[in-house]
Amino acid sequence: MTIDKKPVTAPESDSKSAAGRKYWTQLCTPILSSLLKSSGSYSAEEQETHIQNLSDYVIPNLGPRPSEAHTKSFLTQSGSPFQPSVNFSSKKTQVRYCWELLGPQGGSDSDPLAVEAAQDILSQLCKAFGYSTRWSDTWLSAFAPTLEEAKSVREMLPKWIATFTGGAELPALKRVPFVFVAFDLDGAKTSMKAYYNPKGKEIATGKPASDLTWKVLRSLTPALSSTAIDLVEKFLAERPVFSAVELVGIDLVDEAGLSDARVKLYVHTENNSFNTVRDYITLGGRLQDETTLKGLAILKDIWHLMLQEPDGTDDDYNKPVNDSTMLCQRAYFSFEMRPGRELPEVKTYLPTWNYVRTDLETIQNYEEVFRRCGFEWGKESKYKELFERAFGPANHDRPKPVHCDASYLYSEKKGIYQTLYFSPPLKDGEEYE
């Protein structure tokens, strides 16, 4: 595939855009560079390639610096629209990052939910990397609120959010996010995924996002297995959760690659007990193959550590969250489907930030996770060194933890497959208004 090296850039017509690019360069570049080096998986030339792609395709589209921004990002707890992550497996360690498509006007009165920004930036990215827009355009069309709907969401958000919070008072929110893009860095190659949030459309129309999601899943070409779709739909219908669908993610690939591309449906639950995890991973007992059960047994051994409970828990324990206004953010699951695959693959996610006591304690818990999984990152202070080189001292007094989310998957091909996601602290005392 030939990559169009013309940068996907926001307009450079004013000092605000230039200041934003400078700020995000100073924040994001050292972090990505540090993680690439610490992982031990990338040559110097490969590292340079990924830093250049960050500069060309991402930095220009993160929006103004926080003190001048129209909105903060909801991708991270710090408000950063850039979320780095590290994938740990029995093979090599890989660095990834996700970012929110905001551009110069995302979150402003002219683009309240950053819909126009996402459409423009995603179109340019697909053109630059030679990706098909067939699936992407389908999800954009289905989930994109009109400008009038986007403006109405601002007024409707407080009532909608109160459904999750039990009446607890929240800071005023003006929007929900719309599109994220993830870059997975493998050697010199970058593969991409796009994530589409149906919440804006759901709030504006009052129609459950799940109804629209099933309709779109069944309309895609190449077609996904109807067996897989029916299986997930029935499972979720038996476990009704308000506004359960969080995101739909797809692989961004060229036209030929669509025949093996993934679609991932993300849902949240209101319970984080291991019994809930078992229920979702096995689809209520429907999946009982050797790989599923082996992965479940491994996860059972580390689940209490992922919940930041090093002394252990029983299988029924539903841990309280740090932020009682975020009752919906207890645990997440994704159901991965591909054309021709009859059964979905289930991946588990935890919003670690809602369980963290301190980043230092979380590091200790994850080093124990890595030891139990047989990863070299469990050696004394190895993971801590990676963390501190990228984000500074683990023992800090920042208001938000750096550890953001975590995911777990076990597959026959890859073995244990775990990713840790981070909220980069903002620089220079910057804050969002």
Curated annotation (Swiss-Prot):
Null mutant phenotype: The disruption of the whole terpendoles biosynthesis cluster abolishes the terpendoles production.
Biological classification of the source: Eukaryota, Fungi, Dikarya, Ascomycota, Pezizomycotina
Metabolic or biological pathway, per its Swiss-Prot or TrEMBL entry: Secondary metabolite biosynthesis
Transmembrane segments: none
Keyword match Transferase: yes
Gene that this sequence comes from: terF
Any matching Pfam family: Trp_DMAT
Function in brief: Indole diterpene prenyltransferase; part of the gene cluster that mediates the biosynthesis of terpendoles, indole-diterpene (IDT) mycotoxins including terpendole I, terpendole K, terpendole C, as well as the kinesin Eg5 inhibitor terpendole E. Terpendoles biosynthesis begins with the synthesis of geranylgeranyl diphosphate (GGPP) by a yet unidentified GGPP synthase.
Name the UniProt record assigns to this protein: Indole diterpene prenyltransferase terF
EC assignment: 2.5.1.-
GO molecular function: transferase activity, transferring alkyl or aryl (other than methyl) groups
UniProt-listed GO biological process terms: alkaloid metabolic process
Record family assignment: Belongs to the tryptophan dimethylallyltransferase family.
Keyword tags: Transferase
CDD domains in the cross-refs: PT-DMATS_CymD (cd13929)
UniProt cross-references to InterPro entries, sorted A to Z: Aro_prenylTrfase (IPR033964), Aro_prenylTrfase_DMATS (IPR017795)
Top EC class of this enzyme: transferase
Provenance organism: Tolypocladium album (Soil fungus)
